[in-house]
UniProtKB/Swiss-Prot annotation:
DUMP binds at residues 253, 396, 416-420, 428, 458-460. Gene3D superfamilies: Dihydrofolate Reductase, subunit A, Thymidylate synthase/dCMP hydroxymethylase domain. This is Bifunctional dihydrofolate reductase-thymidylate synthase. It comes from Crithidia fasciculata. The keyword Plastid does not apply.
Amino acid sequence: MSRAAAKFKIPMPVTKADFAFPSLRAFSIVVAADQQHGIGDGETIPWTVPETLAFFKDQTTLLRNKKPPTEKKRNAVVMGRKTWEVPLKFRPLKGRLNVVLSCRRPVDDLLAQLPEEKRAAAAADVVINGGLKEALHLLARPPYCSSIETAYCIGGARVYTEAMQSPCVEKLKEVYLTRVHTAPTCNRFYEFVRRRRARAAVDLESTSGVKVSDAAAHLSYEIMKYVPHNAEERQYLELIDRIMKTGLVKEDRTGVGTISLFGAQMFSLRDNQLPLLTTKRVFWRGVCEELIWFLRGETNAHVLADKDIHIWDGNGSREFLDSRGLTENKEMDLGPVYGFQWRHFGADYKGFDANYDEGVDQIKTIVETLKTNDRRLLVTAWNPCALHKMAVRPCHLLGQFYVNTQTKELSCMLYQRCCDMGLGVPFNIASYALLTILIAKATGLRPGELVHTLGTAHVYSNHVEALKEQLQRVPVAFPVLVFKKEREFLEDYESTDMEVVDYVPYPPIKMEMAV
């Protein structure tokens, strides 16, 4: 039932260059310091702990899957000129893109320091840039936005200081701080501990505990990982915690049972941010394909199943449709659900294989009226006249769009009447974030915010233990979304046209869907 005819489609303008990529690349810091936060004396690091050197090499070289770098994917290490001047035999740091910060020296000067036999190979491993801000701007754009998996800031003191100042600190994802227990002899200091109090809250995600080196005169050390406090995802986790502690235990349609509260969450979409929750991996490809399926007006669950996305299989089964009295529907025909209401509101539903050119096209109307600064920008999936024909009644049922005429930003407020906090809500947050981003692209606006208002926010009883596990995890920074390919029409986008960059979630947590 795809809206293939061009007259029904929504044209997409070419994205302006400033909108296509985040302003700066997210980055991590790797640093070793003594108990007084000293990191060196301007020339050397006054200790040698083989275990911490091995950690530095592995952390900055290996990819997130713990495998070595490849021709298509590696990490970047961003450093000042003095940090670059490690012993000559180590230059450039192998298997990594070396980004050296210098306003005066061209890259040819750095390569000239190397033995002649190393220069040709090193040319592809070394780039030079001004300051950290300029380097992060470079790494946020092609080819580096796709070829670099993680950018690491590795010093020295001036570079660390810039990293903890705006605008760079807003892109900080992680700090790997190795604390070496040794007598203080440094005159260069890393300011993370002091600046974190003044600038942004951080969470200690993990620690190795204090260990004693086997080879460094029995020096002790501790490797700690800090992450900036993710207040937006904390809203989600704190609501789950409140539901499980104070919610009302109720029976529900599925027979599983719920614990519920009647409850708004807000997520920023600025600078390409995508609120894809990090305390468990969210099935991004499923989110993306389902939203595109909605935007095409589809109601045939086979379309998703054929792409190995089975989120609608249970509701489209013969058994479930018959239980809803939809005995005339073909298997996997969900009836006039979300996509049909978005694109054909009020039309008579005749099955997923019929062609439709009637009804109100709410999505196209929103795109067209946004250009006139209209305030009546609503899309609803709740059609009382058609509820009895739907396999499931809409949970996320109303979106309102709003334009900030000063910043040219588009925001969306989603009202969701029924909120499965374990499985559905993480999906819905990402889905309506993507919807807002796509409509912003279609109208030449910047994405602003997603405000998520929850009606009955509930936890299924069979999700409680899994969510307790999730609540023990520390949320990290959200990823960003970049578009690898432009399309002429909104409905023509595919999930492969988009790339999520710097998504480093915890592993998935299995939860059964209540049907």
